[in-house]
């Protein structure tokens, strides 16, 4: 499989290493600013890469969105987070002409977490719910795309939900419909996501901890391996 990388930060550098270990080939890289240290052919436009089988994106909205407005037809794996609604609308439009896969978190364990959460929410309907995510001190967006995904699962199963991002400004007791959303940034934390169900005299915590960023890179590669054989359409872990 011949792979075009969109972005060449820490994540796509891991994708390159792991993909080559699996026998795949990196045929090019698209970056905001070309760098002499990048060990692959650099391009400005997706359509310029004639021999790619798939593109894997671990970048940012500033790089990705202009590329999505260009004319190209290439299976696309997208892991960029930020400006989610705009991104999903654009990917849905593109999926009419090419297979597109999107996940805010490329870990299959996180996908499993969403399924566990979907089963737990109806069972614990009268429990308060708090969501917490923790990442390294260089992560820019908050809350993480994964935490937003967990929140979306809850919203799909509960009515009149209210996200609460900054409780100290409210100066009032917690309301039953509140969903607390908390972000922690520090050190080299790879990624942690926790759902707390707090009831009367008991709590339940569901946690996913990433031990290495390789799980995200491998998840993207595995998605690409499946996507190249799919018809046009929008794919997630649910239907890939």
Swiss-Prot record:
The keyword Ribosomal protein does not apply. One of its GO terms (molecular function) is oxidoreductase activity, acting on CH or CH2 groups, NAD or NADP as acceptor. GO terms for cellular component: cytosol. It comes from the Bacteria. InterPro entries: DapB_C, DapB_N, DapB_N_CS, DHDPR_bac, NAD(P)-bd_dom_sf. Pathway: Amino-acid biosynthesis; L-lysine biosynthesis via DAP pathway; (S)-tetrahydrodipicolinate from L-aspartate: step 4/4. Its EC number is 1.17.1.8. Keywords: Amino-acid biosynthesis, Cytoplasm, Diaminopimelate biosynthesis, Lysine biosynthesis, NAD, NADP, Oxidoreductase. Its main location: cytoplasm. One of its GO terms (biological process) is diaminopimelate biosynthetic process. (S)-2,3,4,5-tetrahydrodipicolinate binds at residues 136, 145-146. It is found in: Cytoplasm. Disulfide bonds: none annotated. PROSITE patterns: DAPB. It catalyses: (S)-2,3,4,5-tetrahydrodipicolinate + NAD(+) + H2O = (2S,4S)-4-hydroxy-2,3,4,5-tetrahydrodipicolinate + NADH + H(+); (S)-2,3,4,5-tetrahydrodipicolinate + NADP(+) + H2O = (2S,4S)-4-hydroxy-2,3,4,5-tetrahydrodipicolinate + NADPH + H(+). The active site is at residues 135, 139. NAD(+) binds at residues 79-81, 103-106. Belongs to the DapB family. Catalyzes the conversion of 4-hydroxy-tetrahydrodipicolinate (HTPA) to tetrahydrodipicolinate. HAMAP family: DapB. This is 4-hydroxy-tetrahydrodipicolinate reductase. The gene is dapB.
């Amino acid at each position: 499989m011949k792979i075009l990388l969109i972005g060449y930060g820490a994540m796509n550098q891991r994708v390159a290493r792991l993909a080559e270990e699996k026998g795949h080939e990196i045929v090019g890289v698209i970056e905001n600013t070309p760098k002499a240290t990048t060990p692959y052919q650099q391009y400005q436009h997706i359509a310029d890469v004639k021999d790619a089988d798939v593109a894997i994106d671990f970048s940012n909205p500033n790089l990705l969105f202009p590329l999505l407005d260009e004319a190209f037809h290439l299976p696309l794996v997208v892991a960029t987070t930020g400006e989610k609604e705009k991104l999903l609308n654009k990917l849905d439009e593109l999926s009419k002409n090419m297979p597109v896969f999107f996940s805010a978190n490329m870990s299959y364990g996180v996908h499993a977490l969403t399924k566990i959460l979907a089963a737990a929410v109806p069972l614990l309907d009268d429990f308060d719910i708090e969501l917490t995510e923790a990442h390294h001190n260089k992560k820019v967006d908050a809350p993480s795309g994964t935490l937003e995904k967990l929140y979306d699962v809850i919203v799909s199963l509960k009515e009149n939900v209210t996200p609460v991002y900054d409780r100290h400004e409210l100066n009032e007791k917690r309301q039953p419909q509140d969903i607390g959303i908390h972000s922690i940034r520090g050190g080299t934390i790879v990624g942690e996501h926790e759902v707390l169900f707090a009831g009367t005299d008991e709590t339940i915590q569901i946690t996913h901890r990433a031990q290495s960023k390789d799980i995200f890179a491998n998840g993207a590669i595995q998605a690409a391996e499946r996507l190249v054989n799919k018809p046009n359409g929008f794919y997630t872990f649910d239907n890939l």
